[in-house]
Amino acid sequence: MTRIPPALRGRGAKALLVALPVGLTGSLVALPFTAQAEPSSDAVISEVYGGGGNSGASYTNDFVELGNAATAPLDLGGWSVQYLPGSPTATSKWQVTPLTGAIPAGGTYLVQEAKGSGGDTALPTPDASGTISMSATTGTVALVHSTTPLTCLTAADCAADGTVKDLVGFGTAVVREGSPATGAGNTTSVSRDTKLTDTDNNATDLTGSVPSPHNTAGGGSGDPSPTPTPTPTPTPRPTP
């Protein structure tokens, strides 16, 4: 998610006045100013699933998976995953799940959320746990370098908040990067490709898929193992 440093926000449309030597112009010349983006943390939300425990679901819990595209681990102390309903009102509040530990280099990190009444497959051992009950079809999840609840309720305000390191809106979410991702439901998540592509457009960066939760140890499966079909007992042949 591309960021503008706080000290430079709101200055992109202005210009800097640069004094040139008197021998050249003897006056001030206005030059365009290009805002520099904040360096990427290389951590993104790699998958969101809010259908845990719903009708038809295999997994019992909602979850958020994080991915680290960097070549070094990322310490998540003081970070959080936060959730906002897809169509927030003036009184809507972000719900917070604090994070601990680190995402391995090139690895994943699993955040378990609320448990539903259905499903028969537990998630892999989570790296962090919360109690947020997410919608299966529409909502916004943010990866935040803070444990203080966000206050932004629009895409523009959230984009201007320097603590927001990545943000995924899905379904009909008002708060999103670009357009919201589609394809989420009781039996499907929205997820990034294996390269963790992030172009700041949720609609193209994440697609509907079979839920595939993985923790920092790499444990997990995208397709819960089906119950094996019993082998039929052979019918004895009569003795001649």
Task: Report the location of each language-model feature.
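Activation on beta-sandwich/Ig-like modules and their edge loops
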Residues: 2-17, 26-186, 193-194, 200-202, ...
